[in-house]
Regions:
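Structural motif
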Residues: 65-76
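Residue-level detector of flexible, active-site-proximal loop/helix-junction positions
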Residues: 27, 65-67, 153, 190
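Alpha-helical cap/lid subdomain in secreted, periplasmic
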Residues: 79-207, 211, 215-226
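Short, well-ordered amphipathic alpha-helices
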Residues: 41-48, 75-76, 127-135
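Serine-esterase "nucleophile elbow" of acetyl-processing enzymes
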Residues: 2-64, 81
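Short, solvent-exposed loop/turn segments at secondary-structure boundaries
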Residues: 32-36, 73, 158-162
């Protein structure tokens, strides 16, 4: 999906349109928001436009059911690489489907090592995504943002799921090695608000949940983009 924004120029001819490229799974798609309701991506785009007083061009590369390995693989596609290179802001959601698959296997085998394997797999793929983005951007381009949304727990009654998600989120936080990169604490946003923020499927956010996610992204600030 491509949402075009009209380009504005300063007197010196500098392009003042910001590009936002969103990568991910069903959360980036906006599943659960309701008919004609935007997910967090479109809401965050609007908040950026308000906060920065700039037009924002949006490109979304996402599909329900994608695992982190699929999202990493997308970064090898020439058109997506081009849009990542141009992007001022990049958001990534992932690992939710890896979690769901792990839960299904655990219910059959009762072996919690399946969660550790999934966590290690997700961490490796997220590291690969950031490395690939860095390669695409090159050393000279540092004026951009990458926002990684960590996992919330849609299954608060499953103690092992919460333990696994919390552990994964701690490891994800360690990827904030560069000033452009921030991990957004979606877990804290949903903790204790599952009834309020989850859709009828009890897995994906509803409209209020996506709004809370967008506000959390906004609260992370805009770094060098605001200078």
């Amino acid at each position: 999906m491509v949402a075009a924004a009209k380009k504005r120029h300063t007197g010196g001819g500098k392009d003042m349109t910001l590009q936002y490229t969103a990568l991910g799974d069903s959360l980036t798609v906006g599943v659960g928001a309701g008919l004609f309701e935007p997910g967090f991506v479109q809401r965050y785009k609007r908040k950026m436009e308000e906060d920065l007083n700039e037009c924002v061009s949006l490109l979304v590369f996402a599909k329900s059911g994608l695992e982190t390995s699929d999202i990493l693989a997308m970064l090898n596609e020439p058109f997506i690489m081009e849009q990542v290179k141009k992007a001022d802001v990049i958001t990534i959601t992932g690992c939710g489907n890896d979690l769901l698959q792990s839960l299904e296997i655990y219910e059959k085998e009762k072996d919690e090592h399946v969660f550790l394997e999934a966590s290690s797999h997700c961490q490796k793929n997220y590291s690969g995504m950031l490395e690939k983005i860095g390669d695409i951007k090159g050393d000279k381009d540092t004026r951009y943002l990458v926002r990684l949304l960590n996992l919330y727990n849609p299954f608060p009654s499953i103690e092992l799921a919460d333990k696994w998600i919390s552990g994964f989120n701690r490891h994800l936080k360690q990827l904030e090695s560069a000033p452009q990169i921030k991990v957004i604490d979606t877990y804290a946003v949903f903790k204790g608000h599952e009834q309020e923020y989850l859709s009828i499927d009890r897995v994906h956010p509803n409209s209020r949940g996506y709004e809370a996610m967008a506000e959390n992204l906004r609260a992370a600030g805009y770094g060098l983009l605001k200078s």
